Every structure is written in C-alpha cells, then in structure tokens.
C-alpha cells in the first residue's frame, strides 16, 4: 500500500523535495511554495486520513513511516529532502531519526521534537482524546472554529480563522480523529538526542510570532530560519518568506 501523492518531475541532478502537510491539510498545502522550485522533483503527499489517503488506516508512527517509504519507492525517489509542517514535520523527524534510506536533508516548520516527561504525555493524550471525540461526533465547522482558538494560532486574524475553518471542514471527521490519536504528540518519543546526532543537514523554520516553536527550535541542533510576518503556519502566512529560506537552504 502507498499514500496518495502528486508528483511533479524536475531536472536531472536537481534535488528531490518531498512535502508533508500538517494535521487536516492535504497535498495542496505546500504547493504554493514547492512550485517555485520547478527545477526540482516535487512530491506532495497526502498523509493517512487526509485527502486522497483518507481511507488508509494507521495504528501509529511506524505505519505512517512504512507507508512513506513505500510511496517514495513507488515514485523511484531514492535521494530526497523531507520538508514537513507541524504533524508533517513530526513525521519527517521520526523518519529521519529512524534512518529512512535516501534522506539528504530535513526541513521542519513548526514541528514539536517531543514531550519530555510522562505527566506532559498523559495530559496531551487526554487533550487529543477529547479533540478526537469531537471530530468524530460534532460538525467539523464547529470543531475547527474552536480548534483555531488554541493559543498556537493566536496570530491568525478573524478572516484567516474563518478561511481555514471552511477549508478544513471538508475533511472526514472519523479519519482525522483516528490519525490524531495514532500520531498524537503523546505517542511520539522525545527526539532531541536523536535529532542532535543526525549526519545530514537539519533546518528549522518558524514564524516570528510563533513564540512557542521559536523556543523549541533552540532545543534542537538545527539551523533556524525565522519567517517574518508569520505565526505558526508560516508557509501559508508568508509563502514568499518560506520560499526565500528554502532557496538559501537548497542553494538554488
């Protein structure tokens, strides 16, 4: 089994870029940024429970990474950079720390490296469980209205919240809930030590108004790019700034 994806071929010898979206996004999320790198091969993946991969079930991170590997092989992508946002960034970090073959570099935007104690994990497990139950039972417009009131999204304007709520409400609540539980931050190990031992380039992007993830970026051995005029979802709020950072990272 493989994940649904959209593949755009590039020029021979150019880097291959593999993009992983955040929770409730899909393969279109990164395209305004990725399509500025038309010389590179670009693979935009739908994570399980999302987009064209809605019907693909997973029990945890191991399943997601197994599916990611199978998808890369199916497209004959043997050497690549992983670029992931939030949930996609956590999947990318997990894949990197587990030694996914062919990975040349890692770019994470607003991805959490992991909770550091059992109390924090227990609290997160309860929180994600409550959200999952709401995604299963309530109209998605109501759930996402509340979802985007969380502190991490404080920099969004009312119009941005309204737009995102309408967009994300097109998802399947049952499969979102299953993916939220399977890849909960509570189920993710603390990756700091493993990330600090990576043998390939590791870059971290965060919006200048995203104080939580700017602080987390200092806890990993990554080169940090702060994206101006942006909060947690920097590639949506300032795509040109993220394009500039990626161009510097990839030396394009």
From Swiss-Prot:
Transmembrane segments: none annotated. One of its GO terms (biological process) is menaquinone biosynthetic process. It is an enzyme of class 4 (lyase). GO terms for molecular function: 2-succinyl-6-hydroxy-2,4-cyclohexadiene-1-carboxylate synthase activity. The keyword Lyase applies. Keywords: Lyase, Menaquinone biosynthesis. The keyword NAD does not apply. Its EC number is 4.2.99.20. It catalyses: 5-enolpyruvoyl-6-hydroxy-2-succinyl-cyclohex-3-ene-1-carboxylate = (1R,6R)-6-hydroxy-2-succinyl-cyclohexa-2,4-diene-1-carboxylate + pyruvate. Pathway: Quinol/quinone metabolism; 1,4-dihydroxy-2-naphthoate biosynthesis; 1,4-dihydroxy-2-naphthoate from chorismate: step 3/7; Quinol/quinone metabolism; menaquinone biosynthesis. Catalyzes a proton abstraction reaction that results in 2,5-elimination of pyruvate from 2-succinyl-5-enolpyruvyl-6-hydroxy-3-cyclohexene-1-carboxylate (SEPHCHC) and the formation of 2-succinyl-6-hydroxy-2,4-cyclohexadiene-1-carboxylate (SHCHC). Monomer. Belongs to the AB hydrolase superfamily. MenH family. This is 2-succinyl-6-hydroxy-2,4-cyclohexadiene-1-carboxylate synthase. It comes from Salmonella heidelberg (strain SL476).
């Amino acid at each position: 089994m493989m994940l649904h994806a959209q593949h755009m071929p590039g020029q021979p010898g150019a880097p291959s870029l593999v993009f992983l979206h955040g929770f409730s996004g899909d393969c279109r999320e990164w395209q305004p940024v990725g399509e500025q790198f038309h010389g590179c091969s670009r693979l935009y993946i739908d994570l399980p429970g999302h987009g064209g991969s809605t019907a693909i079930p997973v029990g945890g991170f191991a399943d997601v990474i197994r599916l990611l590997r199978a998808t890369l092989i199916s497209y004959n992508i043997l050497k690549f950079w992983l670029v992931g946002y939030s949930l996609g960034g956590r999947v990318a970090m997990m894949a990197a720390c587990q030694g996914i073959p062919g990975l040349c570099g890692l770019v994470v935007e607003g991805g959490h490296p992991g909770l550091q104690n059992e109390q924090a994990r227990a609290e997160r497990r309860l929180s994600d469980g409550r959200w999952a139950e709401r995604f299963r039972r309530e109209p998605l417009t109501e759930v996402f209205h509340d979802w985007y009131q969380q502190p991490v999204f404080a920099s969004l304007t009312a119009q941005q919240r309204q737009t995102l709520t309408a967009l994300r409400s097109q998802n399947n609540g049952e499969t979102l809930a299953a993916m939220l539980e399977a890849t909960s931050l509570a189920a993710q190990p603390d990756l700091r030590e493993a990330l600090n031992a990576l043998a390939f380039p590791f870059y971290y992007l965060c919006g200048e108004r995203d104080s939580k993830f700017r602080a987390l970026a200092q806890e990993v051995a990554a080169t940090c790019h702060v994206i101006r005029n942006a909060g947690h979802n920097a590639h949506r709020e300032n795509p040109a700034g993220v394009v500039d950072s990626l161009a510097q990272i990839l030396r394009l």
